[in-house]
Amino acid sequence: MQGPPLLTAAHLLCVCTAALAVAPGPRFLVTAPGIIRPGGNVTIGVELLEHCPSQVTVKAELLKTASNLTVSVLEAEGVFEKGSFKTLTLPSLPLNSADEIYELRVTGRTQDEILFSNSTRLSFETKRISVFIQTDKALYKPKQEVKFRIVTLFSDFKPYKTSLNILIKDPKSNLIQQWLSQQSDLGVISKTFQLSSHPILGDWSIQVQVNDQTYYQSFQVSEYVLPKFEVTLQTPLYCSMNSKHLNGTITAKYTYGKPVKGDVTLTFLPLSFWGKKKNITKTFKINGSANFSFNDEEMKNVMDSSNGLSEYLDLSSPGPVEILTTVTESVTGISRNVSTNVFFKQHDYIIEFFDYTTVLKPSLNFTATVKVTRADGNQLTLEERRNNVVITVTQRNYTEYWSGSNSGNQKMEAVQKINYTVPQSGTFKIEFPILEDSSELQLKAYFLGSKSSMAVHSLFKSPSKTYIQLKTRDENIKVGSPFELVVSGNKRLKELSYMVVSRGQLVAVGKQNSTMFSLTPENSWTPKACVIVYYIEDDGEIISDVLKIPVQLVFKNKIKLYWSKVKAEPSEKVSLRISVTQPDSIVGIVAVDKSVNLMNASNDITMENVVHELELYNTGYYLGMFMNSFAVFQECGLWVLTDANLTKDYIDGVYDNAEYAERFMEENEGHIVDIHDFSLGSSPHVRKHFPETWIWLDTNMGYRIYQEFEVTVPDSITSWVATGFVISEDLGLGLTTTPVELQAFQPFFIFLNLPYSVIRGEEFALEITIFNYLKDATEVKVIIEKSDKFDILMTSNEINATGHQQTLLVPSEDGATVLFPIRPTHLGEIPITVTALSPTASDAVTQMILVKAEGIEKSYSQSILLDLTDNRLQSTLKTLSFSFPPNTVTGSERVQITAIGDVLGPSINGLASLIRMPYGCGEQNMINFAPNIYILDYLTKKKQLTDNLKEKALSFMRQGYQRELLYQREDGSFSAFGNYDPSGSTWLSAFVLRCFLEADPYIDIDQNVLHRTYTWLKGHQKSNGEFWDPGRVIHSELQGGNKSPVTLTAYIVTSLLGYRKYQPNIDVQESIHFLESEFSRGISDNYTLALITYALSSVGSPKAKEALNMLTWRAEQEGGMQFWVSSESKLSDSWQPRSLDIEVAAYALLSHFLQFQTSEGIPIMRWLSRQRNSLGGFASTQDTTVALKALSEFAALMNTERTNIQVTVTGPSSPSPVKFLIDTHNRLLLQTAELAVVQPTAVNISANGFGFAICQLNVVYNVKASGSSRRRRSIQNQEAFDLDVAVKENKDDLNHVDLNVCTSFSGPGRSGMALMEVNLLSGFMVPSEAISLSETVKKVEYDHGKLNLYLDSVNETQFCVNIPAVRNFKVSNTQDASVSIVDYYEPRRQAVRSYNSEVKLSSCDLCSDVQGCRPCEDGASGSHHHSSVIFIFCFKLLYFMELWL
């Protein structure tokens, strides 16, 4: 943006020569702002002086020059009377006006003459409206929803109703989502945006495009743990080097306001840039708050010569120190940190000057404000205030010296000392006259050994040495409240004229006959008003002064919020009451935890935001050096046209004089050397609790000005604050003046601490903490509700305990803990309900724990197709069966039968989770993305897409898109782990490009992302059309072998074809010729042949039909189904075919679709439909994606709309028949029934009617860990991996176990990407960052007692990883856990091992030493399980030896 041009003499004065010749005195003074902005008026001030004709017609024109053509775009005209001072306002410039050359021409005419005429170029200001972007929070976790509002306003804060675009961008500036051409309601638009489970962490932005301008709001996405309490640290910002102590206070409170008990570790650390640092560390107890102190000897010891460079440093003025505080809560052991900086000063007191002018006006008074404070931040004592502040005032005249005279003589110097008493506040005013000959002023202040100084070296220039001074005695000037101005001068004052400028506009003008008068600010004056007062002397000189005053904004529109009560208990219903000034207002409310804004800066719309926004409209010069009357007007950004004498004088290079600069430094040494006076310091970095948003409300008040909403207080024990804004057509914006707070708290409550899951047969300690904030200690009975789903292992005969209850005394303002040893007896999620009863209060909490079956989970699915599609009534009978293996874990079996009336039905219902494997890399993430595209395509073609299903699919796609951008590299390519990989992957880049292109019709895809990926792919194509991969291909079937370049090229070609939408002239002919040539030479493996067939079919190659015929010739036929079987030997027992075989069938089906061979493809579709798992997917991600694409394309051709089938399920597993009715209305509904577990499981399925349906038998069960599962490799099962799990333990340490897992690939070459899943022993966790990433370990995921390690690949060389596990819950009788490794893209290649630790907790160990929990006899407590076993073994051995002897 170009700033306003400096106002030259030609701008300031242009009058008719004839008029000047006869004018007896000045006749006019015209002022106008130097800027123009769209949507804003240009107001011109016109004052006709006493020598002016009685009436003057003033015309103002706004001229625009574009393409060398100047036209008038706005004009206004008015008649002004002699002696008047009024304004002439041009209409506002249209909001869509472009940045052109604009000039303002002002002409004054009488009947006889042109009194004045001149023009000036105006600076075009692009800022025309205000846009506020509000989010409910400023910091989000993955998977959270971002709520935001856009508020668009004119500069007067009236609603600006317009169309705008909204863009969400991630930290890499990728476009994630957009809303285009959005219309607002009274300038307000409210939206939500869902973050994915793995978004790019960092600073995201909401960008709003309106009127060719973009407005931004950032929010941060980060992973963090919610703390239960907050810690604050209070210290002085400054500390005197003479102080004997540095004191401070630490406060630790729960978010609901109660004190924290625990331990404090405090560290005093000098922030030195040199050498080795020393520090002081102290530890002590805290109960809500604690005071601390460092004495001068301690501080000197660490600050003196700790850096080893003391001889080069001025230790009398050391650098700052950092004070670090860690508070550890005694109940849970959780720690929180906070720190602050303290700056050391040479003196005990700080003396500051402010509120003084930077220009001297001789013979008028100089005023300033002086503030005296203690360096340590404490208030001045009465004894200290008995001492005066002594101010030495030195006035000099160096006019000749500084005007360039060679004499350099000092003409005058006057010094006086003034004593001032110090009030309790430490702040006082000083005032004294400036001598008539003064041109310089220096002040030095002294107080109890401390000193400060300031100087003014500028002199206001007036030819007649006539001055006025403008002041106000009022503070906190606000809109609507009058304030007083006082004008003083060194000569008799005439009638005064004034004008007020704010935000680049002339907002008020007038005349006053008194030297003391009042003005009443309006909203247009905010946030800062530039007030000019002047009069004209008899000789025509303009005598002026300027005063800039901050004006507090006061909204005409009011909004008030009230809670129906200020305190409430969690889950209690309360009312939020809203009152506004006008009906038909839009109201936006947000209520969040009180600490949310302390953790990160708020993104709320606050008064501070509004004032800052108003400041952006202020575009004057604001030099602060108004040394003459010309500069006074310039200071307010005004253009002036006058025939009066407007003094203008330049600063004559005073500061270029080296001798002057040297003397200035010497005289002000005390003020300049002490650089710490200017140090901003560092605000304490406080870690705060970041809660969920409670209320996000948008409402139109309609005809009401009062509304009430009933809401339920969340279960959190914390404080909630609500803020709001209101907008109406007439009154514009209004804000709540202060947040309204609701304290959600109960003085007596339970906190449960238990593991996320355990395995059946294990026992765990249920930790129950009772918090008592009543005024008295209370006896509490803690009761666990009895259940047949778990046993309570309490055997004590103590009076205060029974099997399911304990009694304890809980002190006031404190907490106490009891432990109950629990043994779950049922599988699944079981509820545990705890009640605490006392004579004065009670609480009850229910929490779930997941109980898993022992052993290793297995699954089996078998499907049948019920094809009754001949448009006539039919019937059919099918049988499904399954036999559980002998080592099945009793009680783990689950049998389910499902039915649905659509080929894609199982997958549509399983969109949220199609496969059983984790998916944490760049390709696997697409399982959240690609299937949704094919489902949407399919349902759209079938005209069965519902709004709910569409929104669900789009949400998955948007989140998948967010996650996938994590894996895009700087060069535009994609790889399995993004920038962590050494290079991009052509295979994965092609896959992502294809999916993004297919998704583009449904969600917002950044076109730059597509272009960069396409360009990178084309850069990896050889001249013969072949593509190559610079890295390693993670898909095992695309790596190695003679035909891998052929397979890769066929794969990439099918992706590039979709880019023709953006680049129609894409040429893939060389690649097609390459594939045709390779096909003619012969393709031996089915996978490569299937991909080539699909690629050739996609472009209509003459070879496509021949390729498909060859592929069909190699197929297997069975029971009306067609499929392909690879030649590789069986790898493991699995009901599912190889992922490779599924992909081959899918590509074959797609080729049939492209070649319009519908009937020939039906047998393939039948086979693919039967291979799905119970979730609706297949074995892995790539086979699931390709198979669903093929099924969706093919099934869309089938006529299955008319459906009415009665399905009946009978057999031993179903004692009473299960019936499913499938018709046209519910054909997409997945109907489910649980069946009884019998051995073997067999069901008969009969179907009658017409249409199409799929029935699926799903079986889930666990198998016991066999002996072979503990060995390195099972030869019998021909496992693809060697796998060994070694447990490192210490019998004296029950809380740490190290796992050493080693694996290698037993097949030829290397595996594809491998996934190692490590299930931890119950009660253990692995610390974050405990496992380092490497060339092999690309990613580690922590997931509720399980680790997922993504391995780049595994070869014949053994790879080992050490996993340190730490106990975080007490669990005894620990069951075996398992470790597995699997080739991700060929899951049949796998190995599984189980493990356990010999060092276990016993039931006696669960309770430790907590009073009231004694499941074992005294003396047995704490014994180790293995020690007990050894003791029994030894005892029996001795017994038998005795018999033998």
Curated annotation (Swiss-Prot):
Database matches in InterPro entries: A-macroglobulin_rcpt-bd, A-macroglobulin_rcpt-bd_sf, A2M/Complement_sys, A2M_N_BRD, A2M_TED, Alpha-macroglob_thiol-ester_cl, Alpha-macroglobulin_TED, Ig-like_fold
Gene Ontology MF terms in the entry: serine-type endopeptidase inhibitor activity
Bait region (approximate): region residues: 593-702
Effect caused by changing Q1007E: In a colorectal cancer sample; somatic mutation
CDD domains: A2M_2
A GO cellular component entry from the record: platelet alpha granule membrane
Covalently lipidated residues, kind GPI-anchor amidated alanine: A1420
Highest taxon of the lineage: Eukaryota
Impact when changing Y703S: In allele Gov(b)
An annotated GO BP: stem cell proliferation
Pfam families reported in the protein's UniProt record: A2M, A2M_BRD, A2M_recep, MG2, MG3, TED_complement
Tissue specificity statement from the Swiss-Prot or TrEMBL entry: Widely expressed with high level in uterus, aorta, heart, lung, trachea, placenta and in fetal heart, kidney, liver, spleen and lung. Expressed by CD34(+) acute myeloid leukemia cell lines, T-cell lines, activated T-lymphoblasts, endothelial cells and activated platelets. Isoform 4 is expressed in placenta. Isoform 1 is expressed in keratinocytes and placenta.
Function comment: Modulates negatively TGFB1 signaling in keratinocytes.
Family (UniProt): Belongs to the protease inhibitor I39 (alpha-2-macroglobulin) family.
Record note on quaternary structure: Heterodimer; disulfide-linked. Interacts with TGFB1 and TGFBR1. Forms a heteromeric complex with TGFBR1, TGFBR2 and TGFBR3 in a ligand-independent manner.
This protein's name: CD109 antigen
